[in-house]
Curated annotation (Swiss-Prot):
Single GO biological process annotation from the record: proteolysis
PROSITE patterns for the chain: SPASE_II (PS00855)
Keyword DNA damage: no
Family designation: Belongs to the peptidase A8 family.
Record's bilayer topology term: Multi-pass membrane protein
EC number(s) from the headed UniProt entry: 3.4.23.36
InterPro entries registered for this protein in UniProt: Peptidase_A8 (IPR001872)
Lineage top rank: taxon: Bacteria
Pathway it works in: Protein modification; lipoprotein biosynthesis (signal peptide cleavage)
Designated name of the protein: Lipoprotein signal peptidase
Subcellular location: Cell inner membrane
Family annotation (PANTHER family): LIPOPROTEIN SIGNAL PEPTIDASE
Catalyzed reaction equations: Release of signal peptides from bacterial membrane prolipoproteins. Hydrolyzes -Xaa-Yaa-Zaa-|-(S,diacylglyceryl)Cys-, in which Xaa is hydrophobic (preferably Leu), and Yaa (Ala or Ser) and Zaa (Gly or Ala) have small, neutral side chains
């Protein structure tokens, strides 16, 4: 008979880590392809509003602290590793909560994808460039997308939980 998970027992960590691993693999494979295909700073238009490019981000989201002098590489790496530990703890404890755990798995995969870049290259590889006319959204990557989707799902899950408690 299959063992069922109760709210008090937490849940299996492996499925959620598997999702994180898939995010990391897709993120790293796309970055490798972009590094091998594009010159730094070149833009390749795919649609009137979307380009592929190769940008190095030494800061955080939207280039925050990109010119800070190098310390940010290690600070953001440490932050990513710290987030990994907290997320793994939460996944182990709340693995039975599917939407919550999915959101954390996506955030974990994205965070580790960018940590890998910082450790290997000293910066994060960004390549997705959306724009309207001459205005460009800051370039980003699949890891950033996974973090964003995970954060949106986390907010949705919390709103759903709070509304259900009323």
């Amino acid at each position: 008979m299959a063992k069922t998970l109760s709210k008090s027992s937490g849940g299996a960590l492996a499925p959620w880590l598997g999702i994180s691993l898939i995010v990391i693999l897709f993120d790293q494979l796309t970055k490798i392809a972009v590094l091998k295909t594009f010159a730094y700073g070149a833009m390749h238009a795919l649609t009137p509003f979307f380009n592929l490019t190769l940008i190095y981000n030494r800061g955080a989201a939207f280039g925050f602290l990109a010119t800070a002098g190098g310390w940010q590489r290690w600070a953001f790496t440490a932050l990513g590793i710290g987030a990994t530990l907290v997320i793994c703890y939460l996944l182990k404890r709340h693995g039975h909560q599917r939407l919550f755990s999915l959101s954390l798995a996506l955030i974990l995969g994205g965070a580790l994808g960018n940590v890998i870049d910082r450790l290997i290259y000293g910066h994060v590889i960004d390549f997705l460039d959306f724009h309207v006319g001459a205005w460009h959204w800051p370039a980003f990557n699949l890891a950033d997308s996974a973090i964003t989707v995970g954060a949106v799902l986390l907010i949705y899950d919390e709103l759903r939980r709070v509304r259900g408690a009323r």
